[in-house]
């Protein structure tokens, strides 16, 4: 009888270690943020604005979600030459929502390129910020831009409504 208990002990220990390892793997998997981008169309003043939103996996209850609007450059698109997607993912991992949009005549926008003006870009950002506030409860908002998008970001306080 003593021999049977001794041969079962290593198996019981191995089963316990396997169960602990499985719990650790499950916990790490559950804690990984599910921050996949979602392609949507946001109603704008001149029609729908193609956009990609990326939200953090979890946000503190009762707190407004911070938002970063990523503005592409001249003749660019919401992918931002491949730099905006990883940036959006990193921001989401740190609890910050992002939205990337295609301005008039760029990316998936169906508007004519002639509508690609700073005033229209600011109006699109207004629509995007308003949509994100109404739909996702976003609060403090920052604009980050590349090239022409950077120019818009620097002039937005004068041009935009938010």
Model-identified regions with their sequence ranges:
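Short beta-strand element of the alpha/beta-hydrolase
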Residues: 63-73
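The serine-hydrolase catalytic nucleophile loop
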Residues: 76-88, 103
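Conserved Rossmann-like nucleotide-binding pocket used by diverse enzymes
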Residues: 70, 99, 144
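Conserved alpha/beta-hydrolase
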Residues: 88-108
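Catalytic nucleophile-loop/oxyanion-hole region of alpha/beta-hydrolase
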Residues: 78-80, 106-138
């Amino acid at each position: 009888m003593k021999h049977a208990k001794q041969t079962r002990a290593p198996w019981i220990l191995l089963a316990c270690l396997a169960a602990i390892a499985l719990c650790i793997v499950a916990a790490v998997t559950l804690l990984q943020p599910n921050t996949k981008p979602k392609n949507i169309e946001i109603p704008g003043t001149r029609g729908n604005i193609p956009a990609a939103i990326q939200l953090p996996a979890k946000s503190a209850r009762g707190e407004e979600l911070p938002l970063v609007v990523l503005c592409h450059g001249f003749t660019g698109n919401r992918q931002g030459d491949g730099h905006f997607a990883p940036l959006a993912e990193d921001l989401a991992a740190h609890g910050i929502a992002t939205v990337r949009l295609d301005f008039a005549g760029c990316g998936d926008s169906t508007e004519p390129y002639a509508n690609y003006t700073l005033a229209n870009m600011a109006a699109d950002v207004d629509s995007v910020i308003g949509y994100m506030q109404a739909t996702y409860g976003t609060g403090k908002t920052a604009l980050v831009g590349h090239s022409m998008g950077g120019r818009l970001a620097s002039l937005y306080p004068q041009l935009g409504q938010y």
